[in-house]
């Protein structure tokens, strides 16, 4: 597990957590909230390891017995709450793993830490049961709730926890991370970082996915050749995309990046800020052939297509309407 100094972004939260350690003002309950892949589990895990570290600093040493156990995920005083069913955390699971356990003092550490990932899955009964422990915790107890949907937590839970909101990470930092840690080439890292929308976790996922790489190449093939495609070729492309419903949202994101690049290049003639800068010859050509009005219409049509698909409109029909707009000049 990394230390705080190795985490990308989230500087304010890290400062807050380090200050809590330094001033010995560690809260008994925290909510880490942010989009999936934003780093909630990494931050909470690093905080837990630091709190239990035998060196007692604001960074985990990584070498003491406590840190080794945390890294090996077998620390007796860092409890990851589990649940049997995929879509719910029940009152019995909260009782068994937290409520009935919390009065037992730590085995070998200053704190006893409970981490509840996907805390929004706790049903109301489970949350109400946990509330009493949050209100009257033993002095050594720390409960960390991780959620991508804080509104699913009861107001009484939210009001009694320190709330830490994870913000999106700057695309430049995400790209740098992918290039330095995963050795992703510059061009591909640019695409992956843009697509990840500020999520390091999502960026790592797409950067190592052959499926995403193939999808990107397929999207580029369509985008570069859409203007010159015969009707039958366009029909085949639409059918191919409409059959890949699982990745449809990803395709539409890639289409948006492309036409934003065309619009940006048309307006600025600059290449450095483009996502698909390696395709500059095609982008330059489309920028010269399309008007600002046409590009705005295409970007608007892409947003409307996303709305239609969320409303379960026929996929093939929604794509036909989109490609009609793309084919206009």
What are the language-model segments listed below?
Residues 57-58, 108-109, 144, 269, ...:
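Short, polar/charged, Gly/Pro-enriched helix-capping and turn/loop motifs at alpha-helix termini
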Residues 128-145:
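Conserved catalytic/switch belt of AAA+ P-loop NTPases
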Residues 121, 136, 152:
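Residues immediately C-terminal
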Residues 1-49, 69, 139-140, 149-254, ...:
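Charged, glycine-rich active-site and insertion segments that engage polyanionic ligands
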